[in-house]
């Protein structure tokens, strides 16, 4: 599982600046899709081969008793409790504040590794910057500049060494034995535990493990139609005998960890409730992570035909950025629609892992350009020459040519749809990257 790093500190110490620096590489991968809802408090970072999740907790007032500050404090405490590492940020320019002491008092009790980070330290001597903060009792402060990047890489590498220590690595045989890893996500009371029980069946549970650490997730291995699958707990499930029950507390952090760990995500919605902002946030994170996706609309049984039509229209309008995914209208309680849902899981996984040969990709690109040329930008018309695959899960198609920075988002979507149609890539996000030739004589060759 990807470790979770919580950024904690009083308001205006630079948490959002550090968050943006740590996650910017991920943000750059995803174009703004129409209707896509993002929650800017959660993101993914990567240092070398080590990915991690980052939570920006907002301004933390640990003694707040009511109002929005109290709610922010509650959310921060939950994020800290579910994190692997806490980065406690203080302001090197303004020095030690009473709020810093209150936060430090709280953090010393949470039982997590704490990295005390003094931000805005650019141009200052370390001894001067650090002096005030030793009295917090959290070890040696680390001086950084989130705005300029000074010291950030060293600090995050040190944090990841601690976070990854002792995490077992699965080999290829172990991954194959697990089969397709599925995360069932959704807000409370949509029927996640009911669907899990319908999928797994009481006698089909091969293994159930609930480790004591917050980092580890519950894996439920099962077979369906002779194929191995692994369900990843996202709800915080409790086992009563042979039946799984949902714990009502909704954990954003665990949901994001499970999405990151999955091969395919089933986003479960409640047909009897409106699509919420929380639903859209979860869906947006699935897209940003590039995960294969199937949408299950639960509690479909017994709905009036007019309500069904209205629900379908609502889904199409509010989740239009999920147009690559299959929607299934099911009843987990009645076990209806589950077979087709699982077939779409298999199809989405196959699409996410598809191998796309360079000759076929290039042929599809040439056919698409012949059917519809990209628009000129001034005197320049982009020239698309060839394409190759740059990755899987999600599929990445790299297109080479000239003046490709003039390609519009509309034309990019057109190419995506052509590639999807040609290679039957349903159920997975698709990334398209453009690489222009830097040779000024390339057009004359």
From Swiss-Prot:
PROSITE patterns: G_ENGA. InterPro entries: AAA+_ATPase, G_ENGA, GTP-bd, GTPase_Der, KH_dom-like, KH_dom-like_a/b, P-loop_NTPase, Small_GTP-bd. Gene3D superfamilies: 3.30.300.20, P-loop containing nucleotide triphosphate hydrolases. It comes from the Bacteria. One of its GO terms (molecular function) is ribosome binding. Residues 3-167, 180-353 form the EngA-type G domain. GTP 1 binds at residues 9-16, 56-60, 119-122. It holds the Pfam family KH_dom-like. Keywords: GTP-binding, Nucleotide-binding, Repeat, Ribosome biogenesis. GTP 2 binds at residues 186-193, 233-237, 298-301. GO terms for biological process: ribosome biogenesis. Disulfide bonds: none annotated. Residues 354-438 form the KH-like domain. Coiled coil: none annotated. GTPase that plays an essential role in the late steps of ribosome biogenesis. HAMAP family: GTPase_Der. Belongs to the TRAFAC class TrmE-Era-EngA-EngB-Septin-like GTPase superfamily. EngA (Der) GTPase family. Associates with the 50S ribosomal subunit. This is GTPase Der. It comes from Paraburkholderia xenovorans (strain LB400). The gene is der.
């Amino acid at each position: 599982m990807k470790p979770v790093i919580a950024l904690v500190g009083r308001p205006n110490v630079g948490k959002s600046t550090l968050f943006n620096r740590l996650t910017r590489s991920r943000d750059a991968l995803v174009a703004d899709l129409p209707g896509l809802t993002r929650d800017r408090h959660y993101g993914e970072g990567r240092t070398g081969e080590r990915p991690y999740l980052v939570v920006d907790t907002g301004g933390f007032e640990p003694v707040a008793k009511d109002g929005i500050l109290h709610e922010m404090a509650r959310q921060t405490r939950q994020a800290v409790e579910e994190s692997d590492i806490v980065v406690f940020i203080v302001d090197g320019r303004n020095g030690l504040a009473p709020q810093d002491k209150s936060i430090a008092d709280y953090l010393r009790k949470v039982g997590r590794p704490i990295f005390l980070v003094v931000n805005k330290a650019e141009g200052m001597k370390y001894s001067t910057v650090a002096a005030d903060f030793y009295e917090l009792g959290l070890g040696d402060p680390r001086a950084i500049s989130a705005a300029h990047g000074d010291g950030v890489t060293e600090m995050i590498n040190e944090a990841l060494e601690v976070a990854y220590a002792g995490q077992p690595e699965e080999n290829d045989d172990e991954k194959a034995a697990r089969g397709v890893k599925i995360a069932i996500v959704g807000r409370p009371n949509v029927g996640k535990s009911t669907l899990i029980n319908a999928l797994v069946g009481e006698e089909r549970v091969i293994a159930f493990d609930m480790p004591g650490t917050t980092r580890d997730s519950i894996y439920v291995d099962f077979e369906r139609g002779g194929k191995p699958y692994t369900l990843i707990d996202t709800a915080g499930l409790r086992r009563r005998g042979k039946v799984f029950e949902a714990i009502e507390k909704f954990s954003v952090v665990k949901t994001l960890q499970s999405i990151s760990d999955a091969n395919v995500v089933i986003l479960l919605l409640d047909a009897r409730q409106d699509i919420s902002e929380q639903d859209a946030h979860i869906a947006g994170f699935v897209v940003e992570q590039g995960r294969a996706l199937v949408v299950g609309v639960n509690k479909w049984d017994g709905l009036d035909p007019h309500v069904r039509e209205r629900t379908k229209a609502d889904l199409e309008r509010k989740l239009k950025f999920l147009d690559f995914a299959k929607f299934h209208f099911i009843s987990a309680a009645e076990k209806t629609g589950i077979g087709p849902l699982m077939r779409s899981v298999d199809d989405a996984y196959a699409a996410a892992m598809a191998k796309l040969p360079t000759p076929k990709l290039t042929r599809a690109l040439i056919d698409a350009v012949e059917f519809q040329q990209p628009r000129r930008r001034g005197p320049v018309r982009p020239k698309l020459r060839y394409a190759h695959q740059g990755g899987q899960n999600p599929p990445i198609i790299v297109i080479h040519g000239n003046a490709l920075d003039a390609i519009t988002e509309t034309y990019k979507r057109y190419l995506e749809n052509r590639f999807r149609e040609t290679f039957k890539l349903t159920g997975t996000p698709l990334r398209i990257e453009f690489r222009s030739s830097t040779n000024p004589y390339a057009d004359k060759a």
